[in-house]
Amino acid sequence: GQLRAEGRRDEAVKLYRELAKDVRTKEGSEAAYYVIESTFGSGDMDKTEKEVFAFSEREPQAYWLAKAFILLGDVYVKKGDNFQARATWQSVADGYSPADDGIVDEAKARIAKLN
């Protein structure tokens, strides 16, 4: 997170890509999520969407997978597809546990903003 905090995004993403080779570990999943978040930040919604689905197929840690799907909902909003965004966030809110680590609240807050 230090490189990210200092605004050295390119260096950070390079490091995250390396760490993200094994997403079965917490660090690998977290790193992969930050790579996806960086793509989202660059404004490429189609690529972000593809990266989320590719990430989901690699058996990542549940917390970071849920974060990625929350971000996917943000992608759908940017693409003007609020219906798909709501469905994505609702599936996270309904299907994710534990309920107390912030993920479910984050999904529900996104849904509330759409109303």
Give the predicted meaning of each segment.
Residues 1-115:
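Acidic, polar-rich low-complexity tracts and alpha-helical solenoid repeat scaffolds
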